Amino acid sequence: HMDDNIGKLIDLIDELNISNNTIVVFVSDNGGCTMEGDFGGRYPGNNGPFRGSKATTYQGGLSVPFLINWKGRVQRGMVSDDQVMHCDVFATLLDAAGIPLPEMNGQNPMRGMSLLPHMKSGGKRPVPERSMIFELWGNIGLRKGDYKLWANVGREFTPDWKALVNKLKNSDLALFDLGKDPSESKDLREQLPEVYDVLKQELIDHFANVNAEYPPKASTPGK
C-alpha cells in the first residue's frame, strides 16, 4: 500500500508539471522494531545483518532507508554508500531553495551538510567524512569512517551531561570496525588502543561541551 501510494504521489507531481521544482524525501526515523506486542505491533521487523533495533544505538537502530527524488536535478538510479544523517536533510533542502544555513543564534554550528554536491555529481563528489555521535537513554555511540565506539552507561545520566562525561571517562567502551563487522560482534578495543583512545576522547569532549539551544520563545498574537 505504501509503495503504491508513493507512486501515485510521484505520478501526480508529474501530471501537475512541477517535478523539476519538487523534492520528495523518503526516510525513516529509526530501524525496525524486532519485538512484538504493544511496543512492536503484530509484525516485528528484521534488521539483519545489523545488530539491535529501534530504541538502540546499534546499527540496527540507526541504519534506515533514505531516498530522494528530484526529477531532472538528481541522477536517476544513483546509489550511494556514503554516510549521511537526518540533519543533512534540512541542510540539503535549504541549499536546494537557495537559503543560507541558520547561524543557530551565533553559538552552536549547524551539524548537517548539504548533500546536493554529492547527488548532482552522481556520487563523484564524496560526502566529507565526519564523526557521528548518538545518545539515547544512556546508549552512547560515535562513528567515524568504519570505526564505531559504543557503550551503555545507564539512563540516569541523561541529560545530566557532566555526570555522563564522568561516567564515560571511567567506562570501557566497545570498538567495532563496521566495514568488516557490520553486526558489531567483535570488540577491537584491546587490538586497536590508539584508535580507541582518540575516538573516546572525541566523544568525551563532545559531551563536555554540549550546550543545547532552544529557539526564541514564540510571541503570542495580540500581545
Question: Model regions: which residues?
Answer:
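Bilobed periplasmic-binding protein-like "clamshell/Venus-flytrap" ligand-binding domains
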Residues: 128, 203-217
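Extracytoplasmic/secreted proteins, especially bacterial periplasmic and envelope-associated proteins
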Residues: 1-8, 17, 45, 88, ...
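Intrinsically disordered, low-complexity polar regions and short flexible loop motifs
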Residues: 181
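Beta-strand elements within well-structured catalytic alpha/beta cores of enzymes
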Residues: 6, 23-28, 66-67, 89-94, ...
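C-terminal cap/loop subdomain of S1 sulfatases and analogous C-terminal strand-loop tails that border
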Residues: 32-57, 74-78, 82, 87-174, ...
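Metal-dependent active-site segment of extracytoplasmic phospho-/sulfohydrolases and closely related
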Residues: 1-38
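Loop/turn elements at helix/coil->beta-strand transitions in domains of secreted/extracellular proteins
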Residues: 18-24, 64, 128-129, 144-147
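Short glycine-rich loop/turn motifs
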Residues: 63-65, 172
